[in-house]
Structures are given as C-alpha cells and as structure tokens.
C-alpha cells in the first residue's frame, strides 16, 4: 500500500496500491 488506485471487484474494494 500505499496510497493510490483502489483495486478489486466492482462490489467492493480489495486493497490499495
């Protein structure tokens, strides 16, 4: 992480890059 673009499914965020 870090802080940046959210990634994961459209229903919920998995984490941040």
Curated annotation (Swiss-Prot):
Residue stretches making up the Flavodoxin-like domain: 3-17
Domain of life per record: Bacteria
Keyword field: Electron transport, Flavoprotein, FMN, Transport
Cofactor(s) the protein needs: FMN
Family in the record: Belongs to the flavodoxin family.
Function: Low-potential electron donor to a number of redox enzymes.
Protein name (Swiss-Prot/TrEMBL): Flavodoxin A
Organism: Azotobacter chroococcum mcd 1
